[in-house]
Amino acid sequence: AREWRNAQEPVGDSFQPGHPELAKHIIQHFVNQNIDISVTNKLQDDIGAGHAFAFLYRQILPEGNIPIIPLMVNCFYPPNQPTVARCYDVGKELRAAIDSWESDARVAIMASGGLSHFIIDEEIDRIALAALESKDEETLKTLPNDRLILGTTEIRNWVTLGGAMEDMTMNLIDYQPCYRTLAGTGCAMGFATWS
């Protein structure tokens, strides 16, 4: 799409520019690599893009003038959530698609979403973060699906990014398990860059 609506913007509507040319290139690359993908040029008006994208728009791209291509991984809705191995491989192909695009444009790849939540699982968070830092593809591809439950499933976004950035080094900026209750509920927050 030429632009994406952020329906969760607190004041009025917000539209972000898209990049149809690169999007079509990525889609065709995925099809050529036998990666099943769904495509939409319009989101439901009263829903727009989800909060994971809205956070990036407001915090990372506040001017709203950089074209974006939202790639949504089904982290939450069973029964067809991708395995972490599939996520890693899709990330690799995303990077291959971008690298094969004949353009001088600079492209950044970002991911958002939890580490563990709504019940914090520091162990699985730390395993995933350590594997991303050490470029441990085997560990990333074999994270136990039975531990990727509730919001913790969003670790799939991190694994997808790890596949895309496998030739770069991750710099963990911070990891904070933010507990809300003594029962262990809350949200673990992680922030990292790759270079």
Named regions from a protein language model:
Residues 71, 105-113:
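Beta-strand elements within well-structured catalytic alpha/beta cores of enzymes
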Residues 116-118:
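A structural signal for small-residue-enriched, beta-sheet-centric alpha/beta enzyme cores
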